[in-house]
Protein backbone atom coordinates (compact mmCIF):
# COMPACT_ATOMS: atom_id res chain seq x y z
CA UNK A 1 0.00 0.00 0.00
CA UNK A 2 1.19 3.51 -0.82
CA UNK A 3 0.81 6.52 1.47
CA UNK A 4 1.16 10.29 1.46
CA UNK A 5 1.43 12.92 4.18
CA UNK A 6 -0.26 16.30 4.09
CA UNK A 7 1.05 19.04 6.36
CA UNK A 8 -0.59 22.40 7.10
CA UNK A 9 1.97 24.68 8.74
CA UNK A 10 0.07 27.30 10.71
CA UNK A 11 1.31 30.14 12.85
CA UNK A 12 -0.02 28.45 16.00
CA UNK A 13 -0.21 24.72 15.23
CA UNK A 14 0.91 22.28 12.55
CA UNK A 15 -1.63 19.75 11.33
CA UNK A 16 -0.36 16.48 9.87
CA UNK A 17 -2.45 13.91 8.04
CA UNK A 18 -1.68 10.40 6.78
CA UNK A 19 -3.51 9.69 3.52
CA UNK A 20 -4.06 6.85 1.13
CA UNK A 21 -3.12 7.65 -2.47
CA UNK A 22 -6.78 8.13 -3.40
CA UNK A 23 -7.08 10.97 -0.89
CA UNK A 24 -8.72 9.25 2.07
CA UNK A 25 -7.59 10.61 5.43
CA UNK A 26 -6.43 7.68 7.57
CA UNK A 27 -5.25 9.50 10.68
CA UNK A 28 -4.35 13.04 11.76
CA UNK A 29 -2.27 14.77 14.39
CA UNK A 30 -1.57 18.29 15.61
CA UNK A 31 1.63 19.70 17.09
CA UNK A 32 2.51 23.23 18.24
CA UNK A 33 4.41 25.51 15.88
CA UNK A 34 7.83 26.20 17.36
CA UNK A 35 8.63 29.74 16.20
CA UNK A 36 11.72 30.21 18.35
CA UNK A 37 14.92 31.21 16.54
CA UNK A 38 12.89 32.59 13.62
CA UNK A 39 11.22 29.24 13.01
CA UNK A 40 14.46 27.37 12.30
CA UNK A 41 13.24 24.22 14.13
CA UNK A 42 9.88 23.88 12.36
CA UNK A 43 10.93 21.68 9.44
CA UNK A 44 13.07 19.43 11.63
CA UNK A 45 10.23 18.87 14.09
CA UNK A 46 7.81 18.03 11.26
CA UNK A 47 10.28 15.58 9.69
CA UNK A 48 11.00 13.93 13.04
CA UNK A 49 7.29 13.55 13.75
CA UNK A 50 6.56 12.02 10.33
CA UNK A 51 9.48 9.62 10.59
CA UNK A 52 8.25 8.50 14.01
CA UNK A 53 4.81 7.82 12.51
CA UNK A 54 6.37 5.82 9.68
CA UNK A 55 8.35 3.76 12.17
CA UNK A 56 5.50 3.23 14.65
CA UNK A 57 3.12 2.05 11.93
CA UNK A 58 5.71 -0.22 10.27
CA UNK A 59 5.40 1.67 6.99
CA UNK A 60 8.22 1.17 4.52
CA UNK A 61 9.73 4.53 3.63
CA UNK A 62 9.65 3.49 -0.03
CA UNK A 63 5.85 3.24 0.26
CA UNK A 64 5.56 6.96 1.10
CA UNK A 65 5.04 8.67 -2.26
CA UNK A 66 5.63 12.09 -0.77
CA UNK A 67 4.90 14.85 1.71
CA UNK A 68 2.90 17.93 0.78
CA UNK A 69 3.62 21.07 2.81
CA UNK A 70 1.25 24.03 2.93
CA UNK A 71 3.06 27.22 3.98
CA UNK A 72 1.35 30.47 5.11
CA UNK A 73 3.11 32.71 2.62
CA UNK A 74 4.13 33.12 -1.02
CA UNK A 75 5.93 30.10 -2.51
CA UNK A 76 7.54 30.02 -5.96
CA UNK A 77 7.43 27.02 -8.28
CA UNK A 78 10.73 25.66 -6.89
CA UNK A 79 9.56 25.64 -3.27
CA UNK A 80 11.38 28.85 -2.35
CA UNK A 81 9.85 31.13 0.29
CA UNK A 82 11.17 34.70 0.31
CA UNK A 83 9.29 35.71 3.45
CA UNK A 84 6.77 34.12 5.80
CA UNK A 85 5.98 36.62 8.55
CA UNK A 86 3.83 34.33 10.70
CA UNK A 87 6.66 31.77 10.98
CA UNK A 88 9.66 34.11 11.03
CA UNK A 89 11.12 32.68 7.81
CA UNK A 90 13.16 34.67 5.32
CA UNK A 91 14.80 33.42 2.12
CA UNK A 92 14.48 29.65 2.55
CA UNK A 93 13.98 26.89 0.01
CA UNK A 94 11.53 24.84 2.04
CA UNK A 95 11.38 22.05 -0.53
CA UNK A 96 15.14 21.47 -0.57
CA UNK A 97 15.57 21.83 3.19
CA UNK A 98 12.76 19.46 4.09
CA UNK A 99 13.97 16.83 1.62
CA UNK A 100 17.46 16.98 3.16
CA UNK A 101 16.08 16.59 6.68
CA UNK A 102 13.44 13.92 6.01
CA UNK A 103 14.86 11.98 3.05
CA UNK A 104 11.33 11.96 1.61
CA UNK A 105 9.92 13.34 -1.64
CA UNK A 106 8.26 16.71 -0.97
CA UNK A 107 6.20 19.38 -2.67
CA UNK A 108 5.58 22.80 -1.16
CA UNK A 109 2.84 25.32 -1.88
CA UNK A 110 1.00 28.25 -0.38
CA UNK A 111 -1.40 26.87 2.22
CA UNK A 112 -4.55 28.45 0.78
CA UNK A 113 -3.64 27.45 -2.77
CA UNK A 114 -3.12 23.81 -1.87
CA UNK A 115 -6.27 23.88 0.27
CA UNK A 116 -8.18 25.09 -2.79
CA UNK A 117 -6.73 22.20 -4.81
CA UNK A 118 -7.74 19.79 -2.06
CA UNK A 119 -11.31 21.10 -2.07
CA UNK A 120 -11.40 20.78 -5.86
CA UNK A 121 -10.18 17.18 -5.62
CA UNK A 122 -12.11 15.83 -2.63
CA UNK A 123 -14.17 18.59 -1.02
CA UNK A 124 -16.66 21.39 -1.63
CA UNK A 125 -15.17 22.18 -5.04
CA UNK A 126 -15.32 18.63 -6.37
CA UNK A 127 -16.51 18.61 -9.97
CA UNK A 128 -15.54 22.24 -10.55
CA UNK A 129 -12.51 23.70 -12.33
CA UNK A 130 -12.80 27.20 -10.81
CA UNK A 131 -12.46 27.41 -7.02
CA UNK A 132 -11.88 30.32 -4.63
CA UNK A 133 -10.65 29.52 -1.14
CA UNK A 134 -10.31 31.75 1.93
CA UNK A 135 -8.47 30.47 5.00
CA UNK A 136 -8.86 31.99 8.46
CA UNK A 137 -6.49 31.18 11.32
CA UNK A 138 -3.50 32.92 12.83
CA UNK A 139 -3.46 34.78 9.52
CA UNK A 140 -5.72 35.16 6.49
CA UNK A 141 -5.01 33.47 3.18
CA UNK A 142 -6.62 33.20 -0.22
CA UNK A 143 -6.32 30.55 -2.90
CA UNK A 144 -7.62 30.77 -6.46
CA UNK A 145 -7.90 27.94 -8.99
CA UNK A 146 -8.99 28.77 -12.55
CA UNK A 147 -9.43 26.11 -15.21
CA UNK A 148 -7.90 23.62 -12.79
CA UNK A 149 -4.69 25.64 -12.36
CA UNK A 150 -3.51 27.60 -9.32
CA UNK A 151 -3.26 31.35 -9.88
CA UNK A 152 0.10 31.99 -8.22
CA UNK A 153 1.02 35.42 -9.55
CA UNK A 154 4.49 36.42 -10.66
CA UNK A 155 5.95 36.24 -7.13
CA UNK A 156 3.80 33.40 -5.78
CA UNK A 157 1.52 35.80 -3.90
CA UNK A 158 -1.50 35.72 -6.20
CA UNK A 159 -3.98 34.89 -3.43
CA UNK A 160 -2.39 36.72 -0.50
CA UNK A 161 -5.49 38.70 0.46
CA UNK A 162 -4.49 38.84 4.14
CA UNK A 163 -2.04 41.65 3.45
CA UNK A 164 -4.38 43.71 1.34
CA UNK A 165 -4.72 47.15 3.03
CA UNK A 166 -8.28 47.89 4.17
CA UNK A 167 -7.80 50.76 6.69
CA UNK A 168 -5.76 53.89 6.05
CA UNK A 169 -5.75 55.16 9.64
CA UNK A 170 -4.39 52.06 11.43
CA UNK A 171 -1.48 52.98 13.71
CA UNK A 172 -0.52 49.45 14.81
CA UNK A 173 1.74 47.67 12.30
CA UNK A 174 0.88 44.28 10.86
CA UNK A 175 3.38 41.41 11.15
CA UNK A 176 4.43 42.22 7.58
CA UNK A 177 5.35 45.79 8.55
CA UNK A 178 2.49 47.52 6.75
CA UNK A 179 -0.54 49.10 8.42
CA UNK A 180 -4.22 48.28 8.08
CA UNK A 181 -3.94 44.82 6.51
CA UNK A 182 -7.08 42.67 6.37
CA UNK A 183 -5.33 40.10 8.57
CA UNK A 184 -5.22 42.62 11.44
CA UNK A 185 -9.02 42.58 11.72
CA UNK A 186 -10.45 39.24 10.60
CA UNK A 187 -7.85 36.60 11.51
CA UNK A 188 -8.13 34.66 14.77
CA UNK A 189 -5.33 36.72 16.27
CA UNK A 190 -6.58 39.95 14.73
CA UNK A 191 -10.05 39.77 16.24
CA UNK A 192 -8.51 39.16 19.68
CA UNK A 193 -6.33 42.25 19.26
CA UNK A 194 -9.39 44.28 18.28
CA UNK A 195 -11.29 42.89 21.27
CA UNK A 196 -8.58 43.96 23.70
CA UNK A 197 -8.56 47.46 22.22
CA UNK A 198 -12.34 47.70 22.54
CA UNK A 199 -12.37 46.45 26.13
CA UNK A 200 -9.71 49.00 27.13
CA UNK A 201 -11.76 51.88 25.75
CA UNK A 202 -15.28 50.66 26.48
CA UNK A 203 -16.78 50.58 29.97
CA UNK A 204 -19.76 48.41 29.08
CA UNK A 205 -19.97 45.09 30.95
CA UNK A 206 -18.88 42.12 28.89
CA UNK A 207 -18.26 38.45 29.62
CA UNK A 208 -15.11 38.76 27.52
CA UNK A 209 -13.47 40.42 30.53
CA UNK A 210 -13.76 37.12 32.44
CA UNK A 211 -11.17 35.33 30.28
CA UNK A 212 -7.54 35.34 31.39
CA UNK A 213 -6.38 34.26 27.94
CA UNK A 214 -8.95 35.45 25.41
CA UNK A 215 -9.09 33.75 22.02
CA UNK A 216 -11.28 33.97 18.92
CA UNK A 217 -13.46 31.02 19.94
CA UNK A 218 -14.34 32.75 23.22
CA UNK A 219 -15.45 35.83 21.29
CA UNK A 220 -17.70 33.87 18.93
CA UNK A 221 -19.08 31.73 21.78
CA UNK A 222 -20.01 34.82 23.80
CA UNK A 223 -21.52 36.46 20.73
CA UNK A 224 -23.90 33.51 20.30
CA UNK A 225 -24.89 33.96 23.95
CA UNK A 226 -25.84 37.58 23.31
CA UNK A 227 -22.84 39.50 24.63
CA UNK A 228 -23.18 42.98 23.09
CA UNK A 229 -19.45 43.74 22.82
CA UNK A 230 -18.70 40.30 21.34
CA UNK A 231 -21.48 40.77 18.79
CA UNK A 232 -20.11 44.16 17.75
CA UNK A 233 -16.69 42.59 17.23
CA UNK A 234 -18.12 39.78 15.12
CA UNK A 235 -20.23 42.19 13.08
CA UNK A 236 -17.21 44.41 12.42
CA UNK A 237 -15.27 41.52 10.88
Task: Locate predicted features.
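A mobile "lid/hinge" subdomain adjacent to the ATP/sugar-phosphate binding pocket shared
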Residues: 183-237
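Short glycine-aspartate micro-motif
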Residues: 2-8, 64-68, 131-135, 173-175
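Glycine-rich phosphate-binding loop plus the immediately following alpha-helix
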Residues: 108-112, 166-203
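Glycine-rich phosphate-binding loop and adjoining helix at the ATP-binding site
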Residues: 39-48, 55, 62-67, 73-132
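Short glycine-rich anion-binding loops that position phosphate/pyrophosphate groups of nucleotides
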Residues: 12, 72-74, 137-139
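Residue-level signal for inorganic ion chemistry
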Residues: 16, 31, 69, 98, ...
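Glycine-rich phosphate-binding loop of actin/hexokinase-like ATP-binding domains
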Residues: 126-185
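Short glycine-rich, Thr/Ser-proximal phosphate-binding strand/loop in the N-terminal lobe
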Residues: 3-48, 80-82, 156
Amino acid sequence: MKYGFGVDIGGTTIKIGLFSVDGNLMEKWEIPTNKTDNGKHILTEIADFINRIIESKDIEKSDVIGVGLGVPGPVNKNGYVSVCVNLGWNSINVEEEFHKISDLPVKVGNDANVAALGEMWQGAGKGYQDVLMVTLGTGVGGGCVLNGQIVSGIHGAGGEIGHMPVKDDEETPCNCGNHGCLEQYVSATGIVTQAKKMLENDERPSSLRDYDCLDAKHIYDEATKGDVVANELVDST
